[in-house]
């Protein structure tokens, strides 16, 4: 196997920003932020918007998380409104 072609596989903390839930796992994701975990060691931190703790499929609750999607930006840019147009 060739050396130095694969990203570093390391322990990383993922933090769900909507529920403040964090979990430690392994990943190749790159990040500049770090956090001190419960074991006293410092790990890279990745902030995510949705995890199993906040996703409606896993929680059974409907929750509106709107961060302004591409469709809204398109409609705003081209002056389109919702509904049918008159012909």
Swiss-Prot record:
Q: Which domain of life is it from?
A: Bacteria
From the Swiss-Prot or TrEMBL record, what is one GO molecular function term?
structural constituent of ribosome
Instruction: Look up keyword Disulfide bond and say if it applies.
Output: no
Q: Which InterPro entries match?
A: Ribosomal_bL28/bL31-like_sf (IPR034704), Ribosomal_bL31 (IPR002150), Ribosomal_bL31_B (IPR027493), Ribosomal_bL31_sf (IPR042105)
Give an example GO biological process.
translation
On whether Ribonucleoprotein is a keyword of this UniProt record, the answer is yes
According to its record, what are the GO cellular component terms?
ribonucleoprotein complex; ribosome
Q: Hey, which family's this protein in?
A: Belongs to the bacterial ribosomal protein bL31 family. Type B subfamily.
What is its quaternary makeup?
Part of the 50S ribosomal subunit.
Q: Which HAMAP family match?
A: Ribosomal_bL31_2
* NCBIfam families, sorted: L31, PRK01678.1
Please give the name of this protein.
Large ribosomal subunit protein bL31B
């Amino acid at each position: 196997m060739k050396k130095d072609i694969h990203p570093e596989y390391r322990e990383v903390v993922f933090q769900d920003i909507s529920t403040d839930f964090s979990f430690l796992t392994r990943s190749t994701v790159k990040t500049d932020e770090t956090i001190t975990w419960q074991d006293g060691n410092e790990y890279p931190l990745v902030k995510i918007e949705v995890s199993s703790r906040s996703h409606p499929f896993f929680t059974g609750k409907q929750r509106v998380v709107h961060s302004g999607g591409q469709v809204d930006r398109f409609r705003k840019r081209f002056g389109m409104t919702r509904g049918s147009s008159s012909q």
